[in-house]
C-alpha cells in the first residue's frame, strides 16, 4: 500500500507584512512589519506679547472709544452701588444716571470722558430706541427708590429686580456684545484688509484690522490680558476659563 500526504507550503500569509508570500498556504508566524512611528506634532513658540505694526513699523491697533465706554459703565456702576453702601443716606439722582448714559455728564471722575464724543446710549442695541428707553426707565426707577438702610441689603424693586445688575449686566450685552457681534464682526469677512484707512492722519490700520480691534476693545481695554484687564466686565468673567486653560492668552499692542 502506498500512502500519499500533501505538504502545504508555509510562509507569511499576511498581505500587509513586509515578507508576504503569495505562494504560502499556511502561515508560519514569520511575518515582519515596519515599526509604526507616530508623527511628531509641530512645535510653536508662542510669544508673551504681540505687537501689530505695518511694514513701516506704525502701530495698527486702536480702540480708545471702546475703552472710554468701559470706563463710563464702570463709573455708572460705582455710582449705582453707592445706594447700597451709604446706610440709606445716598438717594440716587436720575439726571446723573441719564446724563452718564448719553455722556452729557460733566462730573466724571476721569475728566477725559467729558465731551469726548463717546457715549453708551447711542451704541446700545445698535441704536434701538426701545431698548435704550428700557435702560433709561431702570435708571429712573433706581433713582426713585428709597435706598436700603440695613447693611447687606441691595437697592431693588418690590418684584426683586436689582437695578444695578439690570443696568450693568444689561449694557454689557446690549452695548458691548451687541457692538462686538452685530456691528464689528458680523461683516468683517468683507472688510478691506489691503490698505490703511487714513495713514496721513495716523490711522495705519486697515478696515478689517480696526474692526477686529474695536470688537476686542469691548472685551477688555488691557493689552496684556489676562495679566491685567480681569477686574471688570467681560474680561473679568472670562478670566480663568477657556483662554487661560489652553494657554493662549497673550498681550496685544
Report residues per predicted region.
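Bacterial Sec-dependent N-terminal signal peptides
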Residues: 2-56
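Mature extracytoplasmic or organellar-lumen-exposed domains after removal of signal/transit peptides
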Residues: 36-253
Amino acid at each position: 500500500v502506498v500512502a500519499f500526504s500533501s505538504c502545504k507550503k508555509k510562509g507569511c500569509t499576511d498581505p500587509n507584512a513586509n515578507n508576504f508570500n503569495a505562494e504560502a498556504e499556511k502561515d508560519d508566524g514569520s511575518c515582519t512589519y515596519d515599526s509604526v512611528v507616530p508623527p511628531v506634532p509641530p512645535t510653536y513658540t508662542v510669544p508673551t506679547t504681540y505687537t501689530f505694526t505695518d511694514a513701516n513699523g506704525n502701530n495698527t491697533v486702536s480702540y480708545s472709544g471702546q475703552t472710554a465706554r468701559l470706563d463710563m459703565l464702570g463709573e455708572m456702576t460705582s455710582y449705582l452701588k453707592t445706594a447700597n453702601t451709604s446706610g440709606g443716606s445716598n438717594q440716587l439722582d436720575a439726571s446723573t444716571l441719564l446724563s452718564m448714559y448719553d455722556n452729557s455728564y460733566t462730573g466724571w471722575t476721569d475728566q477725559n470722558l467729558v465731551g469726548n464724543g463717546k457715549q453708551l446710549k447711542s451704541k446700545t442695541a445698535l441704536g434701538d430706541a426701545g431698548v435704550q428707553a428700557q435702560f433709561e426707565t431702570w435708571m429712573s426707577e433706581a433713582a426713585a427708590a428709597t435706598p436700603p438702610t440695613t447693611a447687606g441689603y441691595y437697592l431693588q424693586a418690590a418684584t426683586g429686580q436689582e437695578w444695578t445688575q439690570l443696568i450693568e449686566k444689561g449694557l454689557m450685552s446690549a452695548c458691548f456684545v451687541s457692538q462686538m457681534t452685530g456691528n464689528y464682526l458680523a461683516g468683517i469677512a468683507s472688510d478691506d484688509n489691503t490698505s490703511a484707512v487714513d495713514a496721513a492722519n495716523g490711522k495705519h490700520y486697515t478696515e478689517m484690522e480696526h474692526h477686529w480691534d474695536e470688537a476686542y476693545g469691548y472685551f477688555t481695554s488691557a493689552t496684556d490680558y489676562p495679566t491685567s484687564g480681569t477686574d471688570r466686565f467681560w474680561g473679568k468673567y472670562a478670566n480663568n476659563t477657556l483662554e487661560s486653560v489652553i494657554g493662549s492668552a497673550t498681550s496685544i499692542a
